[in-house]
């Protein structure tokens, strides 16, 4: 008979699996409580969550949500990291943590219901983050607007230059005519 706590854990895992875009499965052996806290903080900053769960409860939740592809990754001490929004930022946070003295061993993960190995996650880390994509898009949108402003301003500038040149040529022509008339009048 399952305990109330196990039922709640399965319900929580099911909710996380339904919301996630990517789940990373890792072995956390060798990490101290301080290391785990640091990792959780880094992941929270990237909009993700890091939980330790029993494999049997994780498997029950996975089967009930259609994520049974995760089963081969559930062996030994297992931690799950769930990314809900900015996946490249999430994977970069894991890679950044793993550059330190303590590391988690990434076994693989899920994108939707598709199983991924750790090499694919490294590729995802090389993708631009949501903020970087926004900056690129805004930069791409601003360039044509700047060009359009130049195109719109060019005819106005040309007209001003033409009028300026025309008024100067009229003045030069009038001055030349006055100069012509003055010597003949004397």
From Swiss-Prot:
Gene3D superfamilies: 3.30.70.1730, 6.10.250.290
Keyword Ribosomal protein: yes
Pfam families for the chain: Ribosomal_L10
GO molecular function: large ribosomal subunit rRNA binding; structural constituent of ribosome
GO cellular component: large ribosomal subunit
Taxonomy, superkingdom: Bacteria
UniProtKB keywords: Ribonucleoprotein, Ribosomal protein, RNA-binding, rRNA-binding
GO BP: translation
Family listed: Belongs to the universal ribosomal protein uL10 family.
Subunit structure: Part of the ribosomal stalk of the 50S ribosomal subunit. The N-terminus interacts with L11 and the large rRNA to form the base of the stalk. The C-terminus forms an elongated spine to which L12 dimers bind in a sequential fashion forming a multimeric L10(L12)X complex.
Protein role: Forms part of the ribosomal stalk, playing a central role in the interaction of the ribosome with GTP-bound translation factors.
Protein name according to UniProt: Large ribosomal subunit protein uL10
